[in-house]
Design a protein with these regions (language model features):
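Short, solvent-exposed aromatic-acidic interface loops
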Residues: 160-166, 239-243, 296-300
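Conserved, well-ordered active-site substructure
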Residues: 198-214, 268-322, 327, 333-361
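Zymogen propeptides
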Residues: 2-215
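Beta-strand-turn-beta hairpins that frame and shape the catalytic cleft
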Residues: 141, 153, 230-231, 285-292
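Extracellular/periplasmic catalytic domains that process cell-envelope and extracellular macromolecules
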Residues: 139, 177-179, 216-218, 227, ...
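Active-site-adjacent helix-turn-beta-strand microarchitecture at beta-sheet edges
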Residues: 191-270
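Short glycine-rich loop/turn motifs
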Residues: 141-145, 220-221, 278-282, 354
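A short, polar/proline- and glycine-enriched secondary-structure boundary/capping micro-motif
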Residues: 167-170, 243-248, 277, 302-308
Length: 361
């Protein structure tokens, strides 16, 4: 067997170094003879192609195009704004025309009913109410007609009793008008004397409740008042639910009903002759919900002066009234406007009564 010669580590390293030395020399020579890369110091290499003037021309062209686009945009906005203003003006004109046309039937109707009353001798007008006072004198009686347009339902209210608030307390129409700050007032429902005072007759609705409870109509008694929507309501009611359905704001009771749905009602015989003629207060409404109040003069309650209910019934129908109700009359009949008593009370002075219808500016 042939023995392998032992080689020391140091001897192996020298041998390896001698073997690669030629290659190291070659690489060193190549590095020395190769020129290193240089950075160019010429700025022209970094200037974009084309001259500065050409570049400026391109930029100017872009700016000009942007200016044209801006002008076109501004012009478009101005045209749109002009069209909007024209459209708004046109719509406004159409609305005014529509409102004018819508109001024409009301104006025509108002002129028609006013023509039957004549020329007003006094007028009150505000954003809540319009009142026109007329004289009436058909020959057999004379008095006043007051036409009322409620622009706001709250412009009409009812007063009950006096400032004392005691049951059965009373006051004159003038006192009620003054105490509540009203511009006008009339007497309202009937009353019954007893227990040291004058108490409202039958069903009376005030301040959201029935004063003495609901009482079904009897002996031709009729309720009359105003609904919360500002419409005159009234008639004979035999159940509370029927009256509640009309949503009353206030109301009082007297007798009789004179007109219903534009037709004359049958006047009870007693009320045709007891008394025959008398000072009267009646209230009615037109189909546009304007109110008409008639207050006739009379020097006493003996039946020789004043108006009959039949005469007033006919007068109201000719005037175009739809529904009408007789209120308390005789010495109770009263009409106050602008701080003065318009009619001449048959008692010689105003009679204190429990209820009044009041009107506010």
């Amino acid at each position: 067997v042939r023995k392998l010669k032992y080689i020391r580590p140091k001897q192996l390293n020298r041998t390896f170094m001698l073997a690669i030395a030629p290659f190291i020399g070659m690489l060193l020579c190549m590095w020395l003879i190769t020129e290193p890369p240089r950075l160019s110091h010429e700025t022209a290499e970094y200037i974009p192609s084309g001259s500065i003037s050409e570049q400026s021309a391109v930029i100017k062209q872009d700016l000009d195009q942007a200016a044209v686009s801006a002008e076109q945009t501004i012009s478009s906005i101005e045209k749109t704004a002009k069209l909007y203003r024209q459209t708004t003006a046109t719509v406004g004109t159409i609305l005014q025309t529509a409102e004018s046309q819508a109001a024409r039937p009301e104006q025509i109707y108002n002129r028609r009913i006013t023509a039957k009353l004549g020329v007003p001798i006094e007028t009150v007008n505000s954003d809540r109410i319009r009142i026109e006072l007329y004289k009436i004198n058909p020959g057999t009686y004379h008095g006043y007609a007051m036409k009322v347009k409620l622009k706001d339902p709250s412009a009409m209210k009812m007063s009950l009793g006096s400032e004392s608030g005691r049951p059965g307390s009373v006051e004159t129409t003038m006192r009620a008008v003054s105490r509540h700050g009203a511009v006008a007032g009339i007497n309202a429902g009937g009353y019954a004397d007893g227990n040291g005072g004058r108490h409202p007759l039958s069903t009376t609705f005030y301040d959201g409740k029935y004063v003495s409870g609901f009482q079904p109509s009897f002996k031709d008694l009729a309720f009359v008042g105003l609904s919360k929507s500002g419409k005159l309501i009234g008639g004979k009611f035999y159940s509370q639910s029927d009256l509640d359905r009309l949503d009353p704001m206030f109301g009082a009771t007297f007798v009789p009903v004179l007109l219903q749905n534009g037709r004359k009602t049958t006047i009870p015989d007693k009320w045709k002759t007891t008394p025959g003629r008398a000072p009267r207060t009646v209230i009615g409404n037109y189909k546009d919900d304007q109110l008409l109040i008639l207050v006739t003069e009379g020097y006493d309650e003996k039946g020789k002066s004043g108006a009959t209910l039949q005469e007033l019934q006919t007068k109201l129908k000719k005037m175009g009234v739809i529904d009408a109700y007789n209120l308390d009359g005789g010495g109770s009949a009263s009409l106050v406007l602008n701080g003065r008593v318009v009619n001449k009370p048959s008692d010689g002075s105003l009679r204190p009564v429990p209820t009044h219808f009041l009107f506010f500016k």
